[in-house]
A protein has these predicted regions:
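A cross-family phosphate/adenosyl-ligand binding-site feature
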Residues: 1-104, 111-180
Length: 180
């Protein structure tokens, strides 16, 4: 599978604040760092800066199969819902919508205001999947990582990507937990 990563300056701040991960400013450095961390094969990961307007995901002639905006601020969500594109992320989302590609948005805020909900409804009516980062607890998570895996598993399911992050509902492990 091929991954194109688009990130914002805010993503750099959040990564440092919430995960103690320092993302370099230059996309090439981020690509090298993440490629090594996740053992990406050559050509499997490509990173684009926020204003690389000539990047493949910015064009309808080379759209990705699917796109995930995770996490998605309400500002970005509103821009995407309105068809505004002041960043590469917003432009790529606009391309995904206009080309009929799968777009999954994972909103970051809580609680939602009426305006947030209206923007999400507008996107959902366009076929965009709104997937709040709300983990389930029926699998009896033992760590924050388990909660993150739950949400990541739901995202991968939306993309049709096979994974073994957690047992599925009805699997033997799931039945054992529910019968206790």
């Amino acid at each position: 599978c091929r991954v194109w990563l688009l990130y914002s300056q805010v993503a750099q701040i959040v990564a440092r604040q919430e995960m103690d991960v320092a993302l370099p400013a230059r996309p090439e450095e981020v690509q090298a760092q993440l490629g090594a961390r996740f053992k990406a094969a050559p050509g499997q990961l490509r990173v684009f800066g926020r204003e690389e307007w000539f990047a493949p995901p910015a064009s309808g002639s080379n759209p990705p199969d699917a796109m995930v905006v995770c996490p998605c601020s309400m500002g970005s969500l509103a821009a995407i819902a309105a068809g505004l594109a002041s960043t590469l992320i917003e432009r790529a989302a606009d391309v995904a919508i206009k080309e009929g590609r799968k777009l999954v948005i994972v909103p970051r805020e809580t609680p939602f205001s009426v305006l947030h909900l209206e923007n999400m409804l507008r996107l959902a009516r366009m076929g965009v999947v709104i997937l709040p980062a709300n983990p389930g607890f029926y699998h009896h998570p033992q760590s924050v990582g388990d909660l993150v895996d739950f949400v990541v598993a739901r995202i991968l399911d939306q993309l049709g990507v096979a994974h073994a992050l957690m047992p599925r509902w009805g699997d033997e492990a799931g039945r054992n937990h529910c019968e206790e």
